[in-house]
């Protein structure tokens, strides 16, 4: 049996609500199998509108950065293909997946179906004494490099390493504990 492939995804967007017209401005996907990074995919995406100033300040992604980028529909098939046989992983998976699903619908692709994993929820189980579950704080605590928070490429890479750290910690736990985690994992929000 082949080991699972994970697509660790991070998006930067023009805001928090695809329902209100916010759009993706950067996507990064890290494909990991057997706890090794197989490939990475990163694109700036033209949102079809100006990036709000507070988003530019948060992400350091400007209108100039996306001016010559293609719109999502030019990348949609490739993104869909990358996710097709993977477990979808993100730090706050509901946010990233809901944005992607909205974009897939908008360009006429079917909704993506598959397993998903939220590293926020996973780290709450594996590192219950962490000071914070913000990606930048976890990265610092777990000694994971994070060059620039709120850049999709750096965040996706750090999230991949957080996932790997969770797996490494899981492998140190007794079987009875792993069975309890598995049983209770079905009640997690994600």
Where are these regions (language model features)?
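Short secondary-structure boundary/hinge segments and terminal tails
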Residues: 24, 74, 122, 156-157
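Generic alpha-helical structural context detector
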Residues: 121-124, 140, 161-164
């Amino acid at each position: 049996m082949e080991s699972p492939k994970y697509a660790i995804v991070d998006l930067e967007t023009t805001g928090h609500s695809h329902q209100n017209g916010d759009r993706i401005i950067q996507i990064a996907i890290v494909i990991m199998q057997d706890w090794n990074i197989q490939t990475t995919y990163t694109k700036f995406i033209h949102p079809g509108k100006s990036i709000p100033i507070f988003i530019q300040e948060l992400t350091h992604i400007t209108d100039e950065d996306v001016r010559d980028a293609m719109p999502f529909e030019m990348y949609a098939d490739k993104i869909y293909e990358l996710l097709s046989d993977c477990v979808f992983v993100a730090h706050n998976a509901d946010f990233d997946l809901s944005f992607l699903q909205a974009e897939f619908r908008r360009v006429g692709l079917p909704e993506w179906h598959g397993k998903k994993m939220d590293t926020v929820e996973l780290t709450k189980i594996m590192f219950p004494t962490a000071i914070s579950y913000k990606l930048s704080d976890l990265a610092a605590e777990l000694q994971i490099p994070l060059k620039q928070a709120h850049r999709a490429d750096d965040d996706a890479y750090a999230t991949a390493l957080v996932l790997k750290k969770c797996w490494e910690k899981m492998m140190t736990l007794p079987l009875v504990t792993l069975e309890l985690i598995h049983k209770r994992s079905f009640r997690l929000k994600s």
